[in-house]
């Protein structure tokens, strides 16, 4: 059986929304027994659509015993449903009736702060490396070549390059 893709589920959800809209319209224009059969038919259609969605989104009991490539889709823009993993925090946000975009924004801000901290540490270590190299060159001139090799290996510039630029 081919994997159920995200676009398939998207289509099923759109169908359900359409059924709900039709039911809303039928209830709004309810005229009594003459429109009752139409309303019953629309509710049955909604029930069928919900059952189909439930079947498509049910956890696959064979997932743990099958190969990992089973859920790969041929279209990377339309992944298989069971290959998508959402962070539990996003699900908690939605369960709490919060906007998942807030979680995304907070997560991005947290990552940016962490990156700034790491950048600061990297620059501090680079400055320390340069100060240490300068002091080692002046204290032990015979190690100048080895110090330059270490500086170059750790991403710094040799003393001669720093003096030019």
UniProtKB/Swiss-Prot annotation:
Tagged with keyword Ion transport: no
UniProt keyword annotation of Kinase present: no
Matches recorded under InterPro entries: Mediator_Med10 (IPR019145)
GO biological process: regulation of transcription by RNA polymerase II
One protein family per Pfam: Med10
Superkingdom of the source species: Eukaryota
Keyword field: Activator, Nucleus, Transcription, Transcription regulation
Stretches for region Disordered: 54-81, 143-165
Record GO terms (molecular function): transcription coregulator activity
GO cellular component: mediator complex
Chief location category: nucleus
Polar residues compositional bias, start-end: 62-77
Compartments, record wording: Nucleus
Spans traversing the lipid bilayer: none
Quaternary structure note: Component of the Mediator complex.
Protein family: Belongs to the Mediator complex subunit 10 family.
Function in brief: Component of the Mediator complex, a coactivator involved in the regulated transcription of nearly all RNA polymerase II-dependent genes. Mediator functions as a bridge to convey information from gene-specific regulatory proteins to the basal RNA polymerase II transcription machinery. Mediator is recruited to promoters by direct interactions with regulatory proteins and serves as a scaffold for the assembly of a functional preinitiation complex with RNA polymerase II and the general transcription factors.
Designated name of the protein: Mediator of RNA polymerase II transcription subunit 10
Record organism: Emericella nidulans (strain FGSC A4 / ATCC 38163 / CBS 112.46 / NRRL 194 / M139)
